[in-house]
């Protein structure tokens, strides 16, 4: 809905628009549901009121959460901004999840937890990305210590245990992830630390890792790998 970075892809559907109605028709026909709306960046000058359109459209799509990241160096202001976004989202029965990333100001699991707790909003939570957790120096044990009510959603992928040789964490995150089971991330321990109510998703952009695959084949490979991995853990 909103580009994750300047110039990035986005599909800004507006409430009661032709595009949104067509999307709803296709959702109804296919059985696909929308969980979260991406992606807001909480900068020092962020104004939640400018994104009422996003919450309105999300409500029409039946979404449950809005995802954001934090890029404000002032923790108190960042928490106030997050709280304001939670209040606006709450008017439409939506929650808000903060996703921490090593290269952002809200960089670690602790940063995200501090922000959510400081904001003090019941519909505020954390979006846990397995890659970001490990690349930011986090561990499954640290994740297990987080009150589970804050762990609203999680994104799974895999990666080598070692850091990117060129130090480019952004490119790795956006173009070079592995499907679950093809890397060395402690996915089993990460999933075990989540709440049974945590919504699981796959985030496996692999345009650098598998540029020859069509998007539908990338999606199928990721889903098949995740199914295989999750089923194996139940045995």
Predicted segment positions?
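Flexible loop residues that form catalytic
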Residues: 1-5, 42, 71, 159, ...
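Histidine-acidic metal/acid-base catalytic patches
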Residues: 28, 59-62, 109-128, 134-235
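Glycine-rich, proline-tolerant flexible connector loops at the mouths of alpha/beta enzymes
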Residues: 1-22
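A short acidic, helix-capping loop that chelates divalent metal ions and anchors anionic groups
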Residues: 4-10, 43, 208-213
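Residue-level preference for long, well-ordered alpha-helices that form the structural scaffold
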Residues: 12, 16-19, 47, 74, ...
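The substrate-binding groove and active-site-proximal loops of carbohydrate-active enzymes
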Residues: 9-10, 38-40, 69, 177-181
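Active-site acidic/histidine proton-transfer and metal-coordination neighborhood
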Residues: 20, 26-126, 135, 233
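Hydrophobic residues within beta-strands of alpha/beta enzymes
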Residues: 1, 35-37, 66-68, 154, ...
């Amino acid at each position: 809905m909103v580009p994750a970075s300047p110039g990035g892809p986005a599909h800004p559907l507006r409430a009661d628009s032709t595009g949104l109605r067509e999307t709803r028709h296709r959702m109804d026909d296919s059985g696909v549901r929308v969980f979260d709306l991406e992606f807001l960046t909480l900068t020092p000058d962020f104004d939640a009121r400018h994104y009422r359109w996003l919450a309105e459209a999300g409500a029409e799509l039946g979404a449950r959460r809005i995802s954001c990241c934090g890029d404000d160096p002032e923790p108190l202001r960042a928490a106030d901004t997050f709280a304001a976004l939670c209040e606006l989202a709450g008017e439409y029965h939506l929650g808000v999840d903060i996703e921490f990333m090593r290269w952002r100001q809200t960089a670690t699991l602790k940063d995200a937890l501090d922000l959510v707790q400081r904001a003090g909003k019941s519909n505020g939570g954390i979006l846990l990305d397995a890659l970001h957790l490990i690349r930011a120096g986090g561990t499954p044990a640290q994740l297990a210590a987080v009150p589970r009510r804050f762990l609203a959603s999680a994104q799974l992928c895999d990666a080598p245990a070692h850091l990117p040789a060129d130090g480019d964490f952004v490119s790795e995150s956006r173009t070079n992830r592995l499907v679950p089971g093809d890397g060395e991330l402690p996915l089993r321990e990460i999933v075990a630390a989540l709440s049974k109510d945590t919504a699981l998703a796959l985030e496996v952009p692999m345009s650098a890792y598998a540029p020859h695959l069509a998007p539908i084949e990338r999606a199928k490979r990721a889903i098949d790998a995740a199914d295989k991995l999750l089923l194996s853990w139940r045995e």
